[in-house]
From Swiss-Prot:
GO terms for molecular function: translation elongation factor activity. Gene3D superfamilies: 1.10.286.20, DNA helicase RuvA subunit, C-terminal domain, Elongation factor Ts, dimerisation domain. The gene is tsf. This is Elongation factor Ts. It is found in: Cytoplasm. The keyword Protein biosynthesis applies. It comes from the Bacteria.
Length: 216
C-alpha cells in the first residue's frame, strides 16, 4: 500500500524516530499506526521518544578544528545532568557530531528551522523543472515532495547521513546514544567556519579533507 507523508509525520511526532525509519515501519506494518509504534520500539528506534520531553539543560560545547586549520566547528549538545555531561560516551558523541558538521556542512540542526520562504523558493524551482516533463499536477506534487525531503536531508544536520556510518542518519545516531546513555540529549546549535569562506579563491574540497583526516 502507499504510505502518505501525513502518516509518516504523525508517526514521527509520536515516536521521535527518523523519517525513513517511520516510513519503513509503516510499510512493514501495512500502514497501521499502533503496530508501527511497536515495530519502532522493538527496533530500539522509539526509545528516545519517552525521554524527549525531559529538560536537557546541562551538556557541553564541543569543538573540532581540521588538521590544516581550514575548518572549525563549535557545537552545543545538551543533556539532563552534569554527570552525563562528563560521561565518556557523551563526550565522544559531541566530538563525533562536531566532526560530522565539519565534513558534511549542514546549514540547520532540524527542518523546523528552515524558513518558509527558503522552502517555497526550492519548491518553485522543483515545480518549474517538473512541469517541463509534462506530467500531471498530482504526480508533479509527489515529485516535489520527494525533492523537498532530499533538500532537507542535504542541509539539516539530523537528517543527513552520518559520515561515520552512512547506513544511518544523525537522528538515528542521536536516538541510539539517548537509548544507551539513558538521558534526553539534544543538539541545540552549531557554527561552522571555513577558511576564506565567501572569498574568491581556488576551489578546494575541504569536506573531503576532513573526512580523509578522520579516516572516514
Amino acid at each position: 500500500m502507499s504510505i502518505t507523508a501525513a502518516q509518516v509525520n504523525e508517526l514521527r511526532k509520536a515516536t521521535g524516530a527518523g523519517l525513513m525509519d517511520c516510513k519503513k515501519a509503516l510499510t512493514e506494518t501495512g500502514g497501521d499506526h499502533e503496530k508501527a509504534i511497536d515495530y519502532l520500539r522493538k527496533k530500539g528506534l522509539a526509545a528516545a521518544s519517552k525521554k524527549a520531553g525531559r529538560v536537557a539543560s546541562e551538556g557541553a560545547v564541543g569543538s573540532y578544528i581540521h588538521a590544516g586549520g581550514k575548518i572549525g566547528v563549535l557545537v552545543e549538545v545538551n543533556c539532563e545532568t552534569d554527570f552525563v555531561a562528563r560521561n565518556e560516551n557523551f563526550q565522544a558523541f559531541v566530538k563525533d557530531i562536531a566532526m560530522h558538521i565539519a565534513a558534511a556542512a549542514p546549514q540547520y540542526v532540524r527542518r523546523e528551522e528552515v524558513t518558509a520562504d527558503v522552502v517555497e523558493r526550492e519548491k518553485e524551482i522543483y515545480r518549474a523543472k517538473a512541469r517541463e516533463t509534462g506530467k500531471p499536477e498530482n504526480i508533479i506534487e509527489k515529485i516535489i515532495e520527494g525533492q523537498v525531503n532530499k533538500f532537507y536531508a542535504d542541509i539539516c544536520l539530523l537528517e543527513q547521513q552520518y559520515v561515520k556510518d552512512s547506513d544511518k542518519t544523525v537522528q538515528q545516531f542521536l536516538n541510539e546514544t539517548i537509548a544507551s546513555i539513558g538521558e534526553n540529549i539534544s543538539i541545540r546549535r552549531f557554527v561552522r567556519y571555513a577558511l576564506g569562506e565567501g572569498l574568491a579563491k581556488k576551489e578546494t574540497d575541504f569536506a573531503a579533507e576532513v573526512a580523509a583526516a578522520a579516516g572516514l
